[in-house]
Amino acid sequence: LYPAGLCTINQREVGRDTRSFSSGLRAALREDPDVILVGEMRDLDTIQTALTAAETGHLVFATVHTQSAADAVDRIVDVFPGERQQQIRLQLSMTLRAVLSQQLLPRRDGPGRVPACEVMRVDGAIRNLIREGKTPQIRNAIQTTGAVGNILMERAVQNLFQGGAISRETMERALQGLPDAGPLAGGMKPRL
């Protein structure tokens, strides 16, 4: 935690400074912040307030526990009742800029972990898929659209193996937990 004073970071601790994530987020909006970091979006009120903050021009960073970028979109939408989900898809499609999904994998060369990151930068194609509720097609869009920097988790894991950062065993374990991971990089060799 950062102590108050001359810092440029103002924070609220749930339980000490505010009753809940959503009430702390609403209070923060009254202070006209440039950037908002929400530790975790777990409930409808917090997600709705974060979406509203993004719509009003704030840069909002938040975490959601999911396996992939497409799962993050579904998790956010599924928190809301059915009659509101189309509105939330529309809000999300207009405000979401990127999703980074990560796994921390054991390093091959010693202690510690290395992040494998799926990156989804939202372009026109992905924006339309979100708006139309076609999240199962997002995986394909990440792989084929022109957004620079997009990468699926399985490619990120394979790149770590090829770069020598993780072992074959670690790569295979990580790929087994992924949907549609395709063939397990049988012919791949690490570059050492």
Predicted regions located by residue number:
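Short, flexible helix-loop junctions that flank or precede catalytic/ligand sites
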Residues: 1-192
